A protein has these predicted regions:
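Short amphipathic alpha-helical segments
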Residues: 44-47, 71-73, 228
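Short alpha-helices
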Residues: 63-133
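N-terminal small/polar loop signature for handling phosphorylated ligands or for N-terminal nucleophile
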Residues: 1-52
Length: 265
């Protein structure tokens, strides 16, 4: 069960057709496992099932440093993990689950999480342990080249048009150390793109040769969503996002602002 619909870019992943955004009323679990965020990040899943979440023990597995790990039966928060999928890969053998289970489908899914959160193992969050875990997943059947290509190097034309509009209004500070842009609902409509196709925009902006801090503002109906990227050894992105009640990692974080774009900017 996911807090949001699975974006179309992941339609190649095994079992994606089983993804749901609502809990079946017939479900009576003994345990709830919340991954990749604290329980509050489950959004409508929590709001629509408050009685269930209050009654059933919760285990929280996450790698975000901003997660306090509170209010659950057990929490494993490891900011040293590149992705929650790294933690799950380490956990599975202790549960008696082989990495090549389900014909390699589990390895495919876990590798996709590693590839996404490390930008194909290019980010500084990639550690020796991350690479060891990845090698185990490849040995278990994960198709690393295909996964990296589908996540980072395959984009519909509508998404490319959207990127072009956002890049055309790129702004920088006087010293070029801060770079930002905004994507609006009008951009999505003009490009014929969907909201999830803004994925990857912030990483493209972060390729700036001079910027220490990069921001992307998504000006949407329900407010402004802010994505932050910072250079290694520089500003802590969680401190910037924290000013808006957000969080994440030292180099990549996000937040939301209920007011207009100009106020957030």
């Amino acid at each position: 069960v996911f807090a949001d619909p699975v974006p179309a870019m992941y339609d190649f992943m095994p079992g994606v057709e089983r993804a749901r955004t609502a809990v079946s009323p017939d479900l009576d679990p003994d345990l709830i496992v919340v991954c990749d965020g604290d329980v509050s990040r489950t959004g409508a899943v929590l709001a629509d099932n408050a009685e269930l979440f209050g009654r059933v023990p919760i285990v929280n597995i996450d790698h975000h440093v901003s997660n306090p790990g509170n209010g659950v039966a057990a929490a494993w928060v490891d900011p040293g993990a590149a992705a929650t999928c790294e933690q799950v890969t380490l956990l599975l053998p202790h549960l008696g689950v082989e990495h090549d289970a389900l014909g390699g489908a589990i390895a495919q899914l876990l590798m996709a999480g590693l590839v996404f959160d490390t930008a194909s193992f290019a980010h500084s969050n990639t550690t020796p342990r991350t690479l060891r875990v990845a090698s185990e997943l490849v040995a278990a059947g994960a198709q690393l080249p295909m996964i990296a290509r589908r996540i980072y190097r395959t984009k519909p034309n509508a998404q490319l048009r959207l990127f072009g509009r956002v890049l055309s209004r790129l702004e920088t500070s006087v010293d070029d150390r801060v770079t930002w842009s905004v994507v609006t609902l009008a951009d999505f409509e003009a490009a014929g793109a969907t909201l999830d196709q803004a994925e990857g925009l912030i990483d493209l902006l972060a390729q700036s040769a001079t910027a220490d801090v990069v921001l992307l503002f998504k000006d949407l109906d329900d407010g402004v969503r802010i994505s932050v990227r910072t250079r290694d050894g520089g500003v802590d992105a969680t401190r910037l996002a924290g000013a808006f009640g957000g969080g994440g990692h030292a180099r990549a974080a996000g937040a939301s602002h209920e007011g207009p774009f100009e106020a957030a900017r």
